[in-house]
Amino acid sequence: YTDCKLAASGLGEEAESSEQSPSPTQLFPWMRPQAAAGRRRGRQTYSRYQTLELEKEFLFNPYLTRKRRIEVSR
């Protein structure tokens, strides 16, 4: 594919040098880790039984109240 492109443009090696990709080590501001204001909570793991109960609840209501989540988690 590059040979066809180079032959069509007639620029030879100059065409390849103009198509440089950014350096893989370059960090953009949005890529830098953010300092957390506080500690993040860890991921909650559920047993098979709890997962089954949650799935049954989600069939009726996809948004559980805090109280209902606590009941299901016991």
UniProtKB/Swiss-Prot annotation:
A motif (Antp-type hexapeptide) lies at residues 27-32. One of its GO terms (molecular function) is DNA binding. Keywords: Developmental protein, DNA-binding, Homeobox, Nucleus, Transcription, Transcription regulation. Its main location: nucleus. Residues 39-74 bind DNA. Gene3D superfamilies: Homeodomain-like. GO terms for cellular component: nucleus. InterPro entries: Antp_homeobox_TF (IPR050948), HD (IPR001356), Homeobox_antennapedia (IPR017995), Homeobox_Antennapedia_CS (IPR001827), Homeodomain-like_sf (IPR009057). Residues 1-28 are annotated as: Disordered. Residues 1-24 have a biased composition (Low complexity). It is found in: Nucleus. PROSITE patterns: ANTENNAPEDIA, HOMEOBOX_2. The keyword DNA-binding applies. Sequence-specific transcription factor which is part of a developmental regulatory system that provides cells with specific positional identities on the anterior-posterior axis. Belongs to the Antp homeobox family. This is Homeobox protein Hox-B8. It comes from Gallus gallus (Chicken). The gene is HOXB8.
